[in-house]
Amino acid sequence: GRLQAFLAKMKEIAAQTL
């Protein structure tokens, strides 16, 4: 669902930030 996509996006951004 959208929540999974949202969490995946956050993880992706976090990975790039850290």
From Swiss-Prot:
Where on the chain is Leucine amide found, per UniProt? 18
What are its GO cellular component terms? extracellular region
Keyword Repeat (UniProt): no
- Note the superkingdom of the native organism: Eukaryota
Q: Which UniProt keywords are listed?
A: Amidation, Antibiotic, Antimicrobial, Fungicide, Secreted
Tell me the Gene Ontology biological-process terms attached to this UniProt entry: defense response to bacterium; defense response to fungus; killing of cells of another organism
| Location relative to the cell | Secreted
**Summary of the tissues where the protein is detected:** Expressed by the venom gland.
Which family is this sequence assigned to? Belongs to the cationic peptide 04 (cupiennin) family. 05 subfamily.
Outline what the protein does. Answer: Inhibits growth of Gram-positive (S.aureus, B.subtilis) and Gram-negative (E.coli, P.aeruginosa) bacteria and fungi (C.albicans).
- What is the recorded name of this protein? M-lycotoxin-Ls3b
